[in-house]
């Protein structure tokens, strides 16, 4: 429902906005100041602002709406729409009028809850004696809502009083207890009592139970039964034999001794599923998840006992299978009824069992001893050995050294069929990967084949090496020697001392570093300083001598006279023009695009045109103004000197050097005689141009920019020195 409100100005208006187009939500009133103009105009919080001074707010941002309200001249007209927000529902439950008793130690018995007087308390003779139970006298005093028995009261009779009740016992006397047994209250009172809480901490039943327990403590002190000092009896332990936890404890205690030991061994050796997956990834899954028979066999051999067990851990095994004697009576006791439990507690029996059923699994934890864990670990390795154990020298055949020739050298299949086939016997390989990988690969790769196998660089970079290099690796890696892998090479190889004598060196190493023949001469040659494009060069003749250079064209040794050009040597008959094949021995040539040309061919095909004389440029070329010039054609229009690599200025389409351009065309300052360059501040006065810092008084040198001045003999003067005679 829309409605319009007009607020009389001026501001403040007394409301706050929220939302807008930039917040992707409509403009709403978020807050109204109490007593303000907005509150007096019946604006409600949460109403939607549809229009401000007749302007729709659908396209307004939050800032635009604020500015629109601020710009209101005198009155502010708002078109609002009632919020569709539902009425908040209270989440708290309505208060329940329940009758609560009067608190005896905080309420005067002569006053009611609302302060009205009640009947006076009866005489002390009418009160109940300490020996009689106070329950019949309390029942007609309280309302029916509190007269019914509850489970809390029955349990409170059998429970041990806590510290609050002990403090009550210390502070009250027997006479005070008799007063508590007969409190005064209005019968049938239904008004709520003061200082109470939902759990009934100060209810009548709680006070009655406290008084009854205090009476029982006094009777126990008088009869001499119970603990010394008149304290309350200790509660007997109530065992719920029907609970699943109790049944599981009894079942674990009644297990036979061998089954308990077997469970302890399995719990100490088995691993979780994540450890089994990790073992499969690392290749050690043969050690995981053993069956029960293997575990039983691992603990039965006698030869492992003296190695792994100790005197401190041996007595733990027989003791772990026996349940504690103190826990067995409580475990076998039948469930007690509720009435029997109260009777046993009322008699103040102190013969409760010393241990609870929760202590029964404790000896099971001691069944795991280092003896079992240590003896089962080595037995796991021996239980999986199917057949005779492989000796230490045998695994030497399964090494990287025996497999390398098949990867690097394409030796025929007949070479590997006789000897390595016999060495790859299933004895060390088939049982498990453990015995095959026990020797480290480092000592297996150090025997004599390592220094003798010295291939040339060609097989290392080509997938198929030359056939003449095959015999060397095949001899070095043919078969596996029967010697153990742990023995050093100077023991297994008889010629080790001759090979590695201090004064000897192998020739195979020199073959690796030195090539068989000289490398092919590439046309690159030594680096020559680069020349400018189009530079005319000439070859230099050299007579025959002891020097034997290589020709830059045919890459052959030159016998006899030769030419030297562009940093290389040439046969005289092979140093020709790339186009007309004319010999360049006695004529000039030009290098262009990695080729040499005679002057005539270069002028015809490659030489650029000069922009001034319109002829071919042979030699150094000047590039300026996006054109090519002879160095002698591109000169200053005033002094006719070539520019070279210096700066020049253009004026009326002609180039000028910097000196002539300043003298001819630049504006000079009349004060300092220096040119006024572009970007400099200048002043035009007295028919001349001045720098802004040069237009000063000729006498006192005060800057006259923007100031009145006088002139005398074409020089500016300030007002103070205007009548100066001598200048």
UniProtKB/Swiss-Prot annotation:
The record, for InterPro entries, names: PDLI1-4/Zasp-like_mid, PDZ, PDZ-LIM_domain, PDZ_sf, Zasp-like_motif, Znf_LIM
Tell me any Pfam family this protein matches: PDZ
The main location is cytoplasm
Record-annotated PDZ domain positions: 1-84
Q: Which GO terms describe its cellular component?
A: adherens junction; cytoskeleton; filamentous actin; perinuclear region of cytoplasm; pseudopodium; stress fiber; Z disc
- Every copy of the LIM zinc-binding domain together lies at 549-607, 608-667, 668-727
The record's account of tissue expression is:
Expressed primarily in skeletal muscle and to a lesser extent in heart. Also detected in brain and placenta.
Q: What is this protein called?
A: LIM domain-binding protein 3
- Name the species this protein comes from: Homo sapiens
The encoding gene is: LDB3
């Amino acid at each position: 429902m829309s409605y319009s409100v007009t607020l009389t100005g001026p501001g403040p208006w007394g409301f706050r906005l929220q939302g807008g187009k930039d917040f992707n939500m409509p403009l709403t009133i978020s807050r109204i100041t109490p007593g303000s103009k907005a509150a007096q105009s019946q604006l409600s919080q949460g109403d939607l602002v549809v229009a401000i001074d007749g302007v729709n707010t659908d396209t307004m941002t939050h800032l635009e709406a604020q500015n629109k309200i601020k710009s209101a001249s005198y009155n502010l007209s708002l078109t609002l729409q009632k919020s569709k927000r539902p009425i908040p529902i209270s989440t708290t439950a309505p208060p329940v009028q329940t009758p609560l008793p009067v608190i005896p130690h905080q309420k005067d018995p002569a006053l009611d809850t609302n302060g009205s007087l009640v009947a006076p308390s009866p005489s002390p003779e009418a009160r109940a004696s300490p020996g009689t139970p106070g329950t019949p006298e309390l029942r007609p005093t309280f309302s029916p809502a509190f007269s019914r028995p509850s489970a809390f009261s029955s349990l409170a009779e059998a429970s041990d009083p806590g510290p609050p009740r002990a403090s009550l016992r210390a502070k009250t006397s027997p006479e005070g207890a008799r007063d508590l047994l007969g409190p005064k209250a209005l019968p049938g009172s239904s008004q709520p009592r003061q200082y109470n809480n939902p759990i009934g901490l100060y209810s009548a039943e709680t006070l009655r139970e406290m008084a009854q327990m205090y009476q029982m403590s006094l009777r126990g002190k008088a009869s001499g039964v119970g603990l010394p000092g008149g304290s309350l009896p200790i509660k007997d332990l109530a065992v719920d034999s029907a609970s699943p936890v109790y049944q599981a404890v009894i079942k674990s205690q009644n297990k036979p001794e061998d089954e308990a030991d077997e469970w302890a061994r399995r719990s100490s050796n088995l691993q979780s599923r994540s450890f089994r997956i990790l073992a499969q990834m690392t290749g050690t899954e043969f050690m995981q998840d053993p069956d029960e028979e293997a575990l039983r066999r691992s603990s039965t051999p006698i030869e492992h006992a003296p190695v792994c067990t100790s005197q401190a851990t041996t007595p733990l095994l027989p003791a772990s299978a026996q349940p504690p004697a103190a826990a067995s009576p409580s475990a076998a006791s039948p469930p007690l009824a509720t009435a029997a439990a109260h009777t046993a507690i009322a008699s103040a029996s102190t013969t409760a069992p010393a241990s609870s059923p929760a202590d029964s699994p404790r000896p099971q934890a001691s069944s795991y001893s280092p003896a079992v864990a240590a003896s089962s670990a080595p037995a796991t390795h021996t239980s999986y050995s199917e057949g005779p154990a492989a000796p230490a020298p045998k695994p030497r055949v399964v090494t990287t050294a025996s497999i390398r020739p098949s990867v690097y050298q394409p030796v025929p299949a007949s070479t590997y069929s006789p000897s390595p086939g016999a060495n790859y016997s299933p004895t060390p390989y088939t049982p498990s990967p453990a015995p095959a990988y026990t020797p480290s690969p480092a000592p297996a790769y150090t025997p004599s084949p390592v220094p003798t196998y010295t291939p040339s660089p060609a097989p290392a970079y080509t997938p198929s090496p030359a056939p003449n290099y095959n015999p060397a690796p095949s001899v070095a890696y043919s078969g596996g020697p029967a010697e153990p892998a742990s023995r050093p090479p100077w023991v297994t190889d008889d010629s080790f001392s001759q090979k590695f004598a201090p004064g000897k060196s192998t020739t195979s190493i020199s073959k690796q570093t030195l090539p068989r023949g000289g490398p092919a001469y590439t046309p690159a040659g030594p680096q020559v300083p680069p020349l400018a494009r189009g530079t005319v060069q000439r070859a230099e003749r050299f007579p025959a001598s002891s020097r034997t250079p290589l020709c830059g064209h045919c890459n052959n040794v030159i016998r006899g006279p030769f030419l030297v050009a562009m940093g290389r040597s040439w046969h005289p008959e092979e140093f020709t023009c790339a186009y007309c094949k004319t010999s360049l021995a006695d004529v000039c040539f030009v290098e262009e695009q990695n080729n040499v040309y005679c002057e005539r061919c270069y002028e015809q095909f490659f030489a650029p045109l000069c922009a001034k004389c319109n002829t071919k440029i042979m030699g150094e070329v000047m590039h300026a103004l996006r054109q090519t010039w002879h160095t002698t054609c591109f000169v200053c229009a005033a002094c006719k000197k070539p520019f070279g690599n210096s700066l020049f200025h253009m004026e009326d389409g002609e180039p000028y050097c910097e000196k002539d351009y300043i003298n001819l065309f630049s504006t000079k300052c009349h004060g300092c005689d220096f040119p006024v360059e572009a970007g400099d501040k200048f002043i035009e006065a007295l028919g001349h141009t001045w720098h802004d810092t040069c237009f000063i008084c000729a006498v006192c040198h005060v800057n006259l920019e923007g100031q009145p001045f006088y002139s005398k003999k074409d020089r500016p003067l300030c007002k103070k020195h205007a009548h100066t005679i001598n200048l």
